UniProtKB/Swiss-Prot annotation:
<protein>
    <recommendedName>
        <fullName>Transcription factor TOG1</fullName>
    </recommendedName>
</protein>
<keyword id="KW-0539">Nucleus</keyword>
<keyword id="KW-0862">Zinc</keyword>
<feature type="binding site">
    <location>
        <position position="44"/>
    </location>
    <ligand>
        <name>Zn(2+) 2</name>
    </ligand>
</feature>
<feature type="binding site">
    <location>
        <position position="21"/>
    </location>
    <ligand>
        <name>Zn(2+) 1</name>
    </ligand>
</feature>
<dbReference type="GO" id="GO:0008270">
    <property type="term" value="F:zinc ion binding"/>
</dbReference>
<dbReference type="GO" id="GO:0006351">
    <property type="term" value="P:DNA-templated transcription"/>
</dbReference>
<dbReference type="InterPro" id="IPR001138">
    <property type="entry name" value="Zn2Cys6_DnaBD"/>
</dbReference>
<keyword id="KW-0238">DNA-binding</keyword>
<keyword id="KW-0805">Transcription regulation</keyword>
<dbReference type="GO" id="GO:0005634">
    <property type="term" value="C:nucleus"/>
</dbReference>
<feature type="binding site">
    <location>
        <position position="34"/>
    </location>
    <ligand>
        <name>Zn(2+) 2</name>
    </ligand>
</feature>
<feature type="DNA-binding region" description="Zn(2)-C6 fungal-type">
    <location>
        <begin position="18"/>
        <end position="44"/>
    </location>
</feature>
<dbReference type="InterPro" id="IPR050987">
    <property type="entry name" value="AtrR-like"/>
</dbReference>
<dbReference type="Pfam" id="PF04082">
    <property type="entry name" value="Fungal_trans"/>
</dbReference>
<comment type="function">
    <text>Transcriptional activator required for growth on non-fermentable carbon sources and that regulates genes involved in fatty acid utilization. Acts as a direct activator that binds the promoters of oleate utilizing genes, encoded key enzymes in beta-oxidation and NADPH regeneration (POX1, FOX2,POT1 and IDP2), the glyoxylate shunt (MLS1 and ICL1), and gluconeogenesis (PCK1 and FBP1). Also regulates the abundance of peroxisomes that are vital for fatty acid oxidation.</text>
</comment>
<feature type="binding site">
    <location>
        <position position="18"/>
    </location>
    <ligand>
        <name>Zn(2+) 2</name>
    </ligand>
</feature>
Amino acid sequence: MAAKRGLAKQKSRVTKACDRCHRKKIKCNSKKPCFGCIGSQSKCTYRNQFREPIEAFFNYTGSLSNDLDNAKCSIAKLKAQLPPSAPASLQKGLANICTELEKIQPQLYLNLDSKEISSYGGLKSIETEIIGKQSKSLNRFSNAFESNTAQNVSMYFGVYSPLLYFASTGISWITKKLISCSNDRETRETIYLFLKFLDASSASHAGPKVTSISPLEYYSKLNGLSCGNDVLIQHIMSNISNEIKGNTNINQTIKFNKPTDWFMYGVQLMEQHHKALDRKSSKKLLPLKYFLEQDELIFCLCLEYFERSLFSTMYDLTILKGLVSLMKHRYWIDDPFVLGRIISTMSRRSLDAGLNRWEYYIGQDEDTAEEYRKLWWDCYWWDRWYSLVTGKQPLIPHEMTSCLFPKDVVGLGVDDSMDCFTLINLVELDPSKFDICISFGYILLTKIITAVFSGLLYNRHFTDYRLFATPNAKDLNGTARQLMVEFSKICKIFQCIQDKLIPFLKQYSENSNVFELYTHFGFAKVCCFQGMESLILRIQNLLQERERIELDSCVKDIRLQTFEASVDILTDVLKHEDTFYIFRCSWFIYAILMNITLNFIETPRRNSICYLSLMCRMIASYNDLFVSSGNVNFKGNNAFSKKLENGTAVSFILTRICCQMYTRSQKMAKESLFCELKKYGQACSDAGQAALDIECIWYRNIIGEHKESSFRKEILSILDREMGDLVNNRVIGVQGKNQEGACYEKLSPSSTSVSVGMDFCSLENFVTAESLPDLLNLFWEDTEFGITKENLGE
């Protein structure tokens, strides 16, 4: 009997369980079902699960929760017993006390047990033990507190990263959804392509990276050079176009004897180079390869002298101006880790210079003060932008910031003391003052991102570890209600923007700067709503069933708004019909395409062919960009070209997923789909055909990737350990299906056989394996997060 004290009460048998459950003589947890149960839509539970132990890391000196309940009950009774003659102010005061008591979060007042913490000698981190298994999710996909294999929140995939879909938990979620809808050959081919994409993209980062070595060392390794730094700089300068250097206005006072001089010269070269991508001048064909080669040369020069300037010009604001200019031209090209180094320097230097405080402006002449105000709000914006694209907390503390808006912005009827609602309501947008309105737009966007990140995503009242470590779920009901209040405020802010600011931006979107601001607003909405969804799911997971259901409508609304915002921004980007402008939007397009794909996966019957046409038109545009450059597969080592190539490949895979989900939900043949897509243009139909053809050239590049990668090694290791001789490391070639493959304009599939290396045996073995669901269960945690009681394939 003693052995059974720690066991949970067994639940009744389920009426339907999958073969895998019967074979292994287990029942699967409804929160962690196997693929078979997903496919049969069964809900099973494990038997003999151990109860969670009460946490031993906290000092429970008393039950604050019970004390609060007693106090609220006493006040409620007192209020009910008041005579009719009692003053109204007394009744109101008692009601206010009850309201304030509701806001108190007992968990936040728990203290750690110092003896337990100091004597802890376990293998897992203290944080892991404190949380235990009370909390099951950090976001829509992850199961971080049940994983025994890896750290789910990494330096790259932050807590609120918009690219969480590409983490292993996100891919696991997508894979299970696809398998639950269909386990046919085409679905398995899609899964294989996704796995191979991750493998190939991991392998592409095996070479030298600008994030891990000095700029000149990076340049020398890429070009196979072995010489001193001065010679390398001369080599870079000699390869920069004379046209770019000739168009750069050099201040005659610059003697180029300081690192700052060289850095600012590099910034001016970058400004001239990027003028070639101006929408008005882009009609003149600029070869992609040439642009990227020149861009990397100039940026390498800038980074080298940026590093040399770090300790030689501690209080020189000249470099700060150069860094702001560099961010404006490079934010859509570089890896976030590279940009993070620049932005962290900008943020620290702007604070050290006192640009964030009004006290430092006293005694300055107005022209200098105005220049510094503009500089400050630029630095503030890029700090918030970085938080948006990485999901990480900002560096600049908003509560310690007090700086006036630039004079021209104040002239629009606003000032720095106003909140987001007031700014939107009072601003007087003037089409004759585009530049000023754009400046206001970035300031407003900065304040909105601050409200979301400081007020919600990194607010201790919603994210403190104590909230997720204590088993008393009823104490979280008040937290959940307050979270909904804050969420409603953010929704209203974005609705106000949609009603007033977005129509203005769309009306004048022919102005490239206006449209750039519009895309920032659209992407910010997507990221903010994704982050809020993750936070709500984290809280929702700890509530009782009734309270959980109350949050379902909120989660549904978030996903709908995220999807609609993604469709809007993709539609408007495509309206420009400017290949190079679409090229510049690549920094956020992949996340947008993934959002649309998730909607196709979850609710395929609700999706229109017009959404699918957007996906096809976008991948056709990226394909045209590479074709116009003369080569789909770049042979060089340019970092951005690799990122663009990988992004285009995954865009084709995502479009393939959407096409498959749509044809199945509509019970439509592929030929009928192509006819429907043809209504949106021949290129749209061609792109759809290419996406569904396993021999498409973009898939050939993925399948033909033979480089070793950590991803491949990890998967093979798990398969070898768990599957034995079912899967082995032999190199098996496979013939690509070559049956009268259609030839599309510009998107022709490969007509040659495809050789597949030592990963998952081969494409043919992978798609014909009888145990694919079991195989996939082995190397990813089974996670199923989302709306309560959702219907698969609805």
